[in-house]
From Swiss-Prot:
CC per GO annotation: plasma membrane
Location of the ABC transporter domain: 3-232
Keywords assigned by UniProt, alphabetized: ATP-binding, Cell membrane, Membrane, Molybdenum, Nucleotide-binding, Translocase, Transport
PANTHER family: SPERMIDINE/PUTRESCINE IMPORT ATP-BINDING PROTEIN POTA, SPERMIDINE_PUTRESCINE IMPORT ATP-BINDING PROTEIN POTA
Organism (species): Thermococcus kodakarensis (strain ATCC BAA-918 / JCM 12380 / KOD1) (Pyrococcus kodakaraensis (strain KOD1))
Subcellular location: Cell membrane
Name of the gene: wtpC
Predominant cellular place of this UniProt entry's protein: membrane
Protein name: Molybdate/tungstate import ATP-binding protein WtpC
CDD domains: ABC_ModC_like
InterPro entries hit by this protein: AAA+_ATPase, ABC_SmlMolc_Importer, ABC_transporter-like_ATP-bd, ABC_transporter-like_CS, Mo/tungstate-bd_C_term_dom, Molybdate/tungstate_ABC-ATPase, P-loop_NTPase
Annotated function: Part of the ABC transporter complex WtpABC involved in molybdate/tungstate import. Responsible for energy coupling to the transport system.
GO molecular function, one term: ATP hydrolysis activity
Amino acid sequence: MVLMVEGISKDYREFHLRDVTFSVEKGEHFIILGPSGAGKTVLLEVIAGIIEPDSGRIFLNGEDITDLPPEKRGLAYIPQNYALFPNMSVFDNIAFGLKVRKVPKAEIGRKVRELSEVLGISHLLKRKPKTLSGGEMQRVAIARALAVEPELLLLDEPFANLDVQTRGRLINEMKRWRKELGFTALHVTHSFEEAVSLGDRVGVMLNGRLVQVGPVREVFSRPASEEVAKFLGFENIVEGLAEGRILRANGLVIELPIEASGRIRVGIRPEDIVLSDEPLKSSMRNTFQAEVQADVEELGELGPRTRKAKGRWSGAFSIRYPLFGAGAGA
């Protein structure tokens, strides 16, 4: 493994990290996913050596780097604002770390040209950062970080300052860059899109704790707790008594995909629910007729407005798995 974080805790202003432990494998794109205020950036800055932890250790390729200064850690950190040097050209920004390391001039030129070609910024090398778009600044920051061939690239909300169109395009390009350049990345974000599109594994951070770590598909389909499930979008939590593959809840008999027993709670994703005002033919396991009453938000000329909607509907939903409770199956 490239990075091992063991038991990191830190009280920093209003942020609190609590016993954070995880590892990043070579060539992996590891995502720390959490809401604003969860402590994601503080964790990244502790790993980078900008903030000193209160307890815990950090290892890079088996070496304890906890007490090393940032420049001795073999890491490259890209903050959310990219931190380009405004008085330098794009070429000199990318070359900065190489010049500090006294790399020969010819090698610097070769490296800058190679990276700028892969990242699509060859035409920008003579320009200053103030003339660049957000997407262009991000590419320059990534090139500058990768120029020094770090063991690990630390990315702090790398797409947060970009418009939706640019963000979608650069997320796709990030996949290509990693394939072509072969870097290892630790990436913090609040975006589900980034986690699903880029992550090999994801760690969910809530209130300063890393509460679940695993492959992206596994974490999103099998959250380890109700807290994680709600963060990941399981808005409908139903509690009832399970016996085998049957859950009895609120007068309903619900079929489960696996066996369970005792009192449990299950989560139903909004996208797993289908409504129809006609009799519904569906392969979904659970079909009911019910009356739906809801507030429906419409976007009008003067902004959003809310009206009441009421009617009888046929509905169907599937439950992918029981979520929580002593009787929940594995």
